Amino acid sequence: MLSHSIQHAVNDTFAPAVARAGSESLDPVVAAKEIYTSLAECEATCVVFYCCTRYPLEQLSKELSRYCGDIKVIGCTSAGEITPLGCRKHSICAFALSKQHFSVETALIENLATFSETDADELVSGMLENLRKRTVSAGPIEQHCFGLTLLDGLSIREELVINALNLSLQDIPLVGGSAGDDQHFVDTQVFCNGRFYSHAAVFMLVNTSCQFEVFSYHHLAPEEEKLVVTQTAPGQRVVEEFNAEPAALEYCRINGLKLEELSSEVFAMNPLAVQIGDQLYIRSIQQVNDDLSLTFFCAIDAGIVLTRMQSSGLHAHTAMVLNELQQRLGNIDLLIGFDCIHRRAEIDKLDLCESMSSLYRDHHMIGFNTYGEQINGLHLNHTFTGVAIGAPHRSQP
């Protein structure tokens, strides 16, 4: 990985296309060194990391920058990590993409509230122009690119930003996740240009000579019970009433719950979804408020109808998804995963951590538990979303 003196010592013939790393040390000096050691064999063009909020973030920034030198580094805080060992908490994980098989452009977006389609057009156009000058793929570059977003998970601006980017990207797929803060819901941050930022987003455009597939799935099945959103707090992702009754009380009623039982775990095990066309999209609840309103992780409008959902088997469904991805791509060298915090709550509740970790290890996943997932122009909840990257095309550089 990293400084040029080390990079030039790596033989291109044997340098891997990708590398993965993780550390459970909360000492930023130790953690950064362990990340560096695991990624050093990859002649990296970029490094992406996800970390818990227990780290002293300023010191972690300095340590990572010291090891990475002029390599592009982006990242964010998380609500749980998927490391080379599997599901973890209070840790850091990372992956590196090699300059032999990847070319990347990164950008920090700070003006989330005013970010427009014009801004997105200018940003994407400039990034594509730069990538064309150093493409690693054959043929039209747009057919060998994907976009990746990391967004402040408390900004309430994900929909605006990803919709603008998606329109500008046209046929280039876009995937990403909303940063977490270990479920404190106080301060989520993204990392770019050597430091952490709040109220911001990071966008990375990736050109690759490797096969890849962008995906997004959920494992939930509909039940009969419905809730109509009858009153909201505009622009706040807060539902005040279902069926003209206090939202929390109606939610409890259809799920057979008591008000005092409501928690993140309960919300994870009793999700709701909105139907758009033939598809059901989950609308996850973040928390119950003192006035009996409910705060959601996604935008939600008055008049929509929500359906009660139940798990159809998280482990079995994830295994099916990963097996199908592997059948289409062959061996997966890296799976960049954005795994909703409510999936993690279900994993913990049902004691699935080791079995899910085994699945993630077998498919070379690096990722984090998010406050929301993005796929193309959609901001989602309760999904397993990401990019599966296969082996390089041997006929290409």
Residue ranges and their predicted role:
Residues L2-P397:
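Hydrophobic alpha/beta core scaffold segments
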